[in-house]
Amino acid sequence: MKKLTLYISACISLFAGAAVAEDQIEEVVVLGEVLFQDQINSLKTPTPVINVPQSVVVVSSEEITRRGFTSIGDIVNHVPGLNTSQGEGHRDAVVFRGVRSTADFFLDGFRDDVQYYRPLYNLEQVEVLKGPNALLFGRGGTGGVINRVTKKGSLGENFTDLGAAADTFGGVSLQIDRNMSANETSAFRVNAHYESLENHRDFFDGDQIGFNPTAKFKLSEATVLDLSYEYIDQERFIDRGIPTGTDGRPVRALRETVFGDPLLNTTELEANLFKALVQHRFSDGIKGNLSVFYGDYDKLYQNFYAAKYNQAETPNEVTLDGYVDTTQRENFQISGNVITEFQTANATHTLLFGVEFIDTASDQDRFNTYFDTSESDKETFSISEGLPLALVGGRGTNSEGQATVNDFTLKLNDDTHVEIEARSMYLQDEIQLSEKFIAVVGARYDEFDIKVNNVKSADIRNRKDGEVSPRAGLIYKPQENTSIYLSYSESFLPRSGEQFANINGDKNQLDPDTFENLELGIKWNVNEALSLSASVFEIDKKSPQVADSDPSTLDVIESSIDGFEVQIQGQLNAKWSINASYGYLDGEQVNRSGNTGLRPRELPENTISLWTSYQLTPKFGLGLGASYQDESFINNSNSATLPSYTRIDAAAYYEVSEDLMIQLHVENVSDRVYFPNAHSTHQASVGEEVNARLSVQWTL
């Protein structure tokens, strides 16, 4: 508590220091216009995208609606350099430039690392920042991050937006966005949604609810307060896909079979999220903010999945494994920063200074399956093509015809209680050297203190890491609408991992993994409505130490990922819009003996995304798109492969009036069988069959 008090004091002192400085900046040239026109929430500074020495993609709420996106995965599939992982059927999982993550998600800049499917109903925009960059986000972000920016109260406006949708699988959704402003100094906004989930796979169903009231208060001409509470309630069936065969590829003949229990393969989440943000303008050249977040998460997931399948010897049998896992996590975060703009000699500086404190308490336990017939966590069942396995509610018949019962309470695998204190301080300077050159330099210091109490093994481990993460970039602007940049940045990941279930290594002496990103890119705003960007990059992962007696540290200790990305998006003319991208990825794994000659998992060499729409009349438009993903390896041993695929989607839009829009989206028009992602060797996801979604947006 003493440390927390110190950090709260440090955050507040930022404002006090800035207030004192206000009386000392009379000699500074006032350049404050740009200070109050923030472009990207997660950058912390009001820098136009074209002046950011990093690959950045911003997806607005309008585009989310127009494209019919319903999940983070939908967005990721259209961002070059990114692809989805399966997430075991209960969480968002993204592969950022070859680096898989289930934790590098942020909500209005706050760390949002619990594993779940994040909703889109209350978002202003989604920001994707590629490449490790600890200066902005601290630990993790080893391949990039996704930041969701929520809608906030709008002063002086009153409106109600309604949305409803239904699809051919039987799923429905309802949504409301209501803003109420009684005067020019206060506004209240409520976003809420309900969604009933269905898809093409047997037994899959679920529902999710989101409720997000917010309030905005203009306390003075210089100070604004935003308050937010969000409630999330989710439940859905877990489907971990189908096995791979002798050729290492998903067995197409098994695509109608669900390898799980129709009653027990389920995940539940309940979350309560509180946020407060104070923004204050000290002068035309100095502004600051103080933000606080508290999140209370209660997560459960239990499942059976295919753990072993031998197509050559026993093609009609599969071995199932499983577990039930619970997580209760409380996450408190407080951060503050000050941005000041000033001149020295012939240079203009935008200086960012900030501090952050995170206090996390996480209780996690896992019980493995235990079958009475095998007296272990695994049991073998017969497969009948197109029919469900003989397992319902934990009871069934094994491949030998014996009645078998599973018990989720007998075999404790893990029971851990984790406490984390993370403290950070960062400083960055954006320097306008001349009309054509901008330099960005900065660094962040993170102190990560973790205590893991493993109740099962009666083992308590402690570890404290202190890491400095630099960032540097140089931008050349041959003209105002074009930038060429070279950048270097770093991040790190403690050996406790992204979900910090344990501390690997003997005597807790292993230093964090480090990630380095070197990137060269170009951004060109062709006009106000059309932009082009391209970049080449290299990400190197380094594990400085291994522990001979700890198998978890002896797998792949280093990797190198190289890539190229290009994207064009915007309006070709008043009627025709386009969003097209191409990504190329290559990489190698390195172990203690050197280059293994193996390619990292989930690293498709080529990915292509195209979406174009054309307004045939002032009221009617059509859209058409295609997504291509090259084959990729499911595992690091390169023994299992996801085949390449191409998916074609289409859409139609009809504007009934200025206040009413009807949209039809058709996914997988050619009804192609494809496998978009996987979690491990015998868990390949089956892509959705052709389906249509009709939606209506109505403004009152």
Task: Give a label for each model feature.
Residues 436, 536-540, 555-637, 670-673, ...:
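Gram-negative outer-membrane beta-barrel transporters
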Residues 218-220, 329, 348-350, 356-360, ...:
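Structural signature of Gram-negative outer-membrane beta-barrels, strongest in the C-terminal barrel
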Residues 23-157, 520:
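Acidic, small-polar-rich N-terminal luminal/periplasmic segments of exported/outer-membrane proteins
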